[in-house]
């Protein structure tokens, strides 16, 4: 078979195709899509005949499903005089083929091993490499023919199984879809073309191949010419037409070389189709040239994105591998050091977590939660103070009526003052305990998340850490609650430094006076409406009872402000100290204590089977991606 690629492409073809073949052989296609040409067609479309004509070897033929696994057909053109060479690879095995006539049986044997004897299909790839002076530099992926109806022995959904397999390949944007259609059927009704149009509606990566031109009904030849001229169903890459060996010629043992000569004569002499030959749209050699050029151009176009994808996948894989950790070493001494390092790193991160420092194991920030919740606590205390200020006038008046004894008007009842203050402070106790429990749980979750990040893949070590975290949480929460309740008991002792109280009282009086003056101005502005202008202060001061109440309210507001601000700070300090800092310190002590228990070391280092398998898979993936990256750099 003669090929007329110009020297420019001759120099680019083999290296480009070899690069993609090498990447595919590495298994990179598991990680990203590679440029490829996938061959699809309905059953009996002549697909196998086209591939036979291109490769020069007989492929499995017959009725029903013949191609039962994706077949990667790698053709490498050799110099004239060099010997034919073949090799088949599948399921991590490789076998040399000495004789071209053995290819068909080798493929059948591989399919039986992979898809089972009979009519089942498999997604696993068979790779067939052929080196010969009579083949083009080209790699194709042959896919099973599309079956419309299940035959004896086939699953009822065989058609859907095949379509699913085909879609797996043709959906990828990196794949050129080679659609094989017989000339003697309505092209618009073929399943293969419909599937190609579903994934490539604009026809940008679809190439049509018409077969069996000798079976065209008389009078419809011009329709075939119109199809090839892209005037019926448009495809950007256009159409080619070929005539391969028919069953009669195969029975007569017509060689592929002779079949190529007969094909050439058929088109040259055909009354209608000769124009397609003259235009370069016909014969297997012209198809081979077009496919080679299309593939090389496609590879060149895909190369920049391919490099980007490999670099992205490398970064993703390294990150995933880092999360999996390195795994424990085999040497007993090294295993102990490994465990010490792992536990020490965890406990140091626990301390850093409690102090708001940066962590080595992931991004966990419990302080943002604490800051938000402490802010809510302060806002709650402030609201409580405002509500208290609004209701104390009524409470003081009611209390005076019920409990004032022999005192003369104008004397402040200190007992009334104490009772009201204590009652108001007591109302903050349960909300404070509730806040403690919320933040204790937040701290527990943060420490558990840290343990999960630190001990990924070591379930027993993680369980040990979690158990200790849960126990410490209960202990520290209980201690913190007791401390808070003690704090509130102390707050029931009405006390503050005289200077502090005097300062607060003066400030409160000044605020009240400013408020009254504001009310006075407001009332003066309203006097033109006939409203009486009365000084609030004179009204209150005019009555001894009111003077007493006013004085009492000033004292209550002043003291409550001091006590509430004390609690606004003290509650967060207790929580932060006990359920965070002390929590972390005790966790550090207890985890380091486990290192003293030498008998438990092997148990603690038992690794999760899934993590071990995942690490091995990621290491394998990293290895092939690095090789792929090197291939691209050297290309």
From Swiss-Prot:
<dbReference type="GO" id="GO:0005886">
    <property type="term" value="C:plasma membrane"/>
</dbReference>
<dbReference type="GO" id="GO:0005874">
    <property type="term" value="C:microtubule"/>
</dbReference>
<feature type="region of interest" description="G1 motif">
    <location>
        <begin position="41"/>
        <end position="48"/>
    </location>
</feature>
<comment type="function">
    <text>Does not inhibit strain RB-1 of the fish pathogen, infectious hematopoietic necrosis virus (IHNV).</text>
</comment>
<feature type="domain" description="Dynamin-type G">
    <location>
        <begin position="31"/>
        <end position="304"/>
    </location>
</feature>
<feature type="region of interest" description="G4 motif">
    <location>
        <begin position="211"/>
        <end position="214"/>
    </location>
</feature>
<dbReference type="GO" id="GO:0005525">
    <property type="term" value="F:GTP binding"/>
</dbReference>
<feature type="domain" description="GED">
    <location>
        <begin position="549"/>
        <end position="635"/>
    </location>
</feature>
<dbReference type="InterPro" id="IPR003130">
    <property type="entry name" value="GED"/>
</dbReference>
<keyword id="KW-0539">Nucleus</keyword>
<dbReference type="GO" id="GO:0098793">
    <property type="term" value="C:presynapse"/>
</dbReference>
<feature type="region of interest" description="G3 motif">
    <location>
        <begin position="142"/>
        <end position="145"/>
    </location>
</feature>
<protein>
    <recommendedName>
        <fullName>Interferon-induced GTP-binding protein Mx2</fullName>
    </recommendedName>
</protein>
<dbReference type="Pfam" id="PF00350">
    <property type="entry name" value="Dynamin_N"/>
</dbReference>
<keyword id="KW-0963">Cytoplasm</keyword>
<dbReference type="GO" id="GO:0034340">
    <property type="term" value="P:response to type I interferon"/>
</dbReference>
<dbReference type="InterPro" id="IPR045063">
    <property type="entry name" value="Dynamin_N"/>
</dbReference>
<feature type="binding site">
    <location>
        <begin position="211"/>
        <end position="214"/>
    </location>
    <ligand>
        <name>GTP</name>
    </ligand>
</feature>
<keyword id="KW-0547">Nucleotide-binding</keyword>
<dbReference type="Pfam" id="PF02212">
    <property type="entry name" value="GED"/>
</dbReference>
<dbReference type="GO" id="GO:0003924">
    <property type="term" value="F:GTPase activity"/>
</dbReference>
<dbReference type="GO" id="GO:0031623">
    <property type="term" value="P:receptor internalization"/>
</dbReference>
<dbReference type="GO" id="GO:0016185">
    <property type="term" value="P:synaptic vesicle budding from presynaptic endocytic zone membrane"/>
</dbReference>
<dbReference type="InterPro" id="IPR000375">
    <property type="entry name" value="Dynamin_stalk"/>
</dbReference>
<dbReference type="GO" id="GO:0008017">
    <property type="term" value="F:microtubule binding"/>
</dbReference>
<feature type="binding site">
    <location>
        <begin position="142"/>
        <end position="146"/>
    </location>
    <ligand>
        <name>GTP</name>
    </ligand>
</feature>
<dbReference type="InterPro" id="IPR027417">
    <property type="entry name" value="P-loop_NTPase"/>
</dbReference>
<keyword id="KW-0342">GTP-binding</keyword>
<dbReference type="InterPro" id="IPR020850">
    <property type="entry name" value="GED_dom"/>
</dbReference>
<dbReference type="Pfam" id="PF01031">
    <property type="entry name" value="Dynamin_M"/>
</dbReference>
<dbReference type="GO" id="GO:0005634">
    <property type="term" value="C:nucleus"/>
</dbReference>
<comment type="similarity">
    <text>Belongs to the TRAFAC class dynamin-like GTPase superfamily. Dynamin/Fzo/YdjA family.</text>
</comment>
<feature type="binding site">
    <location>
        <begin position="41"/>
        <end position="48"/>
    </location>
    <ligand>
        <name>GTP</name>
    </ligand>
</feature>
<dbReference type="InterPro" id="IPR022812">
    <property type="entry name" value="Dynamin"/>
</dbReference>
<dbReference type="InterPro" id="IPR030381">
    <property type="entry name" value="G_DYNAMIN_dom"/>
</dbReference>
<dbReference type="GO" id="GO:0051607">
    <property type="term" value="P:defense response to virus"/>
</dbReference>
<feature type="region of interest" description="G5 motif">
    <location>
        <begin position="243"/>
        <end position="246"/>
    </location>
</feature>
<dbReference type="InterPro" id="IPR001401">
    <property type="entry name" value="Dynamin_GTPase"/>
</dbReference>
<dbReference type="GO" id="GO:0005829">
    <property type="term" value="C:cytosol"/>
</dbReference>
<feature type="region of interest" description="G2 motif">
    <location>
        <begin position="66"/>
        <end position="68"/>
    </location>
</feature>
<dbReference type="InterPro" id="IPR019762">
    <property type="entry name" value="Dynamin_GTPase_CS"/>
</dbReference>
């Amino acid at each position: 078979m003669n090929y007329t690629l110009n020297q420019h492409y001759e120099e680019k073809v083999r290296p480009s195709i070899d690069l993609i073949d090498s990447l595919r052989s590495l298994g990179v296609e598991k990680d990203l899509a590679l440029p490829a040409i996938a061959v699809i067609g309905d059953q009996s479309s002549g697909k196998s005949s086209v591939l036979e004509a291109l490769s020069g070897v007989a492929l499995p033929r017959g009725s029903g499903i013949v191609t039962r696994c994706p077949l990667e057909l790698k053709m490498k053109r050799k110099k004239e005089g060099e010997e034919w060479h073949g090799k088949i690879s599948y399921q991590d095995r490789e076998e040399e083929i000495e004789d071209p006539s053995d290819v068909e049986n080798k493929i059948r044997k591989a399919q039986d091993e992979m898809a089972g004897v009979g009519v089942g299909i498999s997604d696993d790839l068979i790779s067939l490499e052929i080196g010969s002076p009579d083949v083009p530099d080209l790699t194709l992926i042959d896919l099973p023919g599309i079956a419309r109806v299940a035959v004896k022995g086939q699953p009822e959904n065989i058609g859907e199984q095949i379509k699913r397999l085909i879609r797996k390949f043709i959906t990828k944007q990196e794949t050129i879809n080679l659609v094989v259609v017989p000339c003697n059927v309505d092209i618009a009704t073929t399943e293969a073309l419909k599937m190609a149009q579903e994934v490539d509606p604009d026809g940008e990566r679809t190439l049509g191949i018409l077969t069996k031109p000798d079976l065209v009904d008389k009078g419809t030849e011009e329709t075939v010419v119109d199809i090839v001229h892209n005037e019926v169903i448009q495809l950007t890459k256009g159409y080619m037409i070929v005539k391969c060996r028919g069953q009669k010629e195969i029975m007569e043992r017509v060689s592929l070389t002779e079949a190529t000569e007969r094909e050439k004569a058929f088109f040259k002499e055909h009354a209608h189709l000769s124009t397609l030959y003259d235009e370069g749209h016909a014969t297997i050699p012209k198809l081979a040239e077009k496919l080679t050029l299309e593939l090389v151009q496609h590879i060149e176009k895909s190369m920049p994105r391919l490099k980007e994808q490999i670099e992205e996948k490398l970064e993703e894989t390294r990150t995933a591998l880092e999360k999996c950790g390195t795994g424990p070493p085999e040497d007993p001494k090294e295993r102990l050091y490994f465990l010490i390092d792992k536990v020490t790193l965890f406990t140091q991160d626990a301390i850093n977590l409690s102090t708001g420092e940066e962590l080595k194991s992931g991004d966990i920030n419990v302080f943002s939660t604490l800051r938000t919740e402490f802010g809510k606590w302060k806002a709650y205390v402030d609201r409580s103070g405002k509500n208290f200020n609004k209701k104390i006038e009524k409470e003081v008046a009611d209390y005076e009526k019920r409990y004032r004894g022999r005192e003369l008007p104008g004397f402040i009842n200190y007992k009334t003052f104490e009772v009201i203050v204590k009652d108001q402070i007591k109302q903050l106790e349960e909300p404070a305990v509730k806040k403690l429990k919320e933040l204790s749980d937040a701290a527990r979750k943060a420490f558990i998340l840290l343990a999960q990040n630190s001990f990924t893949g070591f379930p027993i070590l993680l369980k040990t850490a979690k158990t200790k975290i849960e126990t410490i949480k209960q202990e520290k929460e209980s201690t913190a609650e007791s401390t808070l309740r003690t704090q509130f008991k102390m707050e029931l002792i009405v006390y503050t430094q005289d200077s502090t109280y005097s300062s607060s009282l003066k400030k409160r009086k000044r605020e009240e006076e400013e408020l009254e003056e504001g009310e006075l101005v407001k009332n003066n502005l309203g006097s033109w409406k006939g409203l009486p202008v009365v000084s609030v202060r004179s009204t209150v001061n005019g009555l001894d009872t009111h003077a007493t109440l006013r004085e009492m309210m000033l004292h209550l507001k002043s003291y409550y402000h001091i006590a509430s601000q004390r609690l606004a700070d003290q509650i967060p300090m207790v929580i932060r100290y006990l359920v965070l800092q002390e929590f972390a310190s005790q966790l550090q002590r207890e985890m380091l204590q486990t290192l003293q228990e030498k008998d438990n070391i092997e148990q603690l280092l038992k690794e999760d089977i899934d993590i071990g398998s995942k690490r091995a898979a990621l290491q394998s993936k990293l290895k092939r991606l690095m090789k792929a990256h090197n291939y691209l750099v050297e290309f």
